[in-house]
């Protein structure tokens, strides 16, 4: 039945995504080919205070990364730019410097750093139009949206963002620090709270998220052969988050 098919969509997305990932690996060679780094500890944190994390001896760190603070639609020539398909995309230098500092202090001490890539609502309507999902609900409980990979401009910006940050932080020279993985969104099966695209059924949500994941994976893989791209599910596992209805949240493991 339709409901039964929908329940399996979040499991299927993983299989389909990695099937397409394998095809993309054979079709396009990465600019930088390295092995995935290894560490001798499982200890990890979602880090806010870098020095505290280092004092605790963590070897895995997750940092929130807000694309709304990154993009510069005004094309300020003092900001770094990325050229994609003949178009120029500019990125906020002060925000990059801030993230550089956190990443480099961690990775220089042997910590494996993962970025949680997020789309927060900003006070800039132009930025919101570029990065936020067109169907994100105004009444959402948090300021987080699914990514805009729906419109042409949104998709172009998303790919440019992912290529730019993979080049910057998964580069062999590590001059800005090193990122080993990119987590696309946060707890997306409870999307109403953490990756909002309005009220939606599981089938339509996963189709949208799969498109975003494929764009992210392709962008990262064009730069790095080894950096990983992750989906993010909540900790409720095989039950739906009870605070939401079936158009707001789905079980992560049917």
Annotated model-derived regions:
Residues 6, 170-173, 224:
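Secondary-structure transition/hinge residues
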Residues 28-170, 174-177, 181-183, 189-201, ...:
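N-terminal substrate-binding region of glycoside hydrolase catalytic domains
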């Amino acid at each position: 039945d339709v409901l039964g098919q929908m329940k399996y969509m979040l499991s299927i997305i993983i299989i389909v995504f990695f099937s397409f990932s394998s095809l993309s690996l054979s079709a396009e060679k990465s600019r930088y080919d390295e092995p995935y780094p290894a560490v001798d500890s499982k200890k990890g944190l979602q880090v806010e205070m870098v020095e505290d994390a280092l004092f605790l001896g963590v070897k895995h760190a997750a940092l929130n990364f807000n694309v709304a603070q990154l993009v510069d639609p005004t094309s300020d020539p003092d900001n770094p730019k990325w050229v994609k398909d003949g178009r120029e995309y500019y990125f906020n230098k002060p925000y990059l410097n801030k993230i550089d500092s956190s990443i480099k202090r961690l990775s220089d001490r042997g910590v494996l750093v993962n970025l949680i890539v997020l789309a927060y609502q900003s006070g800039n309507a132009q930025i919101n139009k570029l990065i936020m999902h067109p169907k994100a609900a105004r009444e959402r409980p948090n300021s987080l949206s699914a990514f805009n990979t729906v419109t042409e401009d949104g998709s172009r910006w998303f790919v440019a963002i992912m290529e730019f940050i993979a080049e910057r932080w998964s580069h062999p020279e590590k001059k800005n620090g090193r990122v080993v993985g990119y987590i696309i969104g946060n707890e997306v099966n409870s999307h109403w709270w953490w990756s909002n695209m309005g009220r939606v059924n599981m089938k339509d949500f996963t189709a949208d998220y799969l498109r975003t994941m494929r764009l992210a994976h392709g962008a990262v893989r064009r730069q790095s052969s080894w950096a990983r791209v992750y989906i993010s599910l909540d900790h409720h596992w095989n039950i739906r988050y009870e605070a939401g209805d079936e158009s707001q949240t789905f079980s992560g493991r049917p």
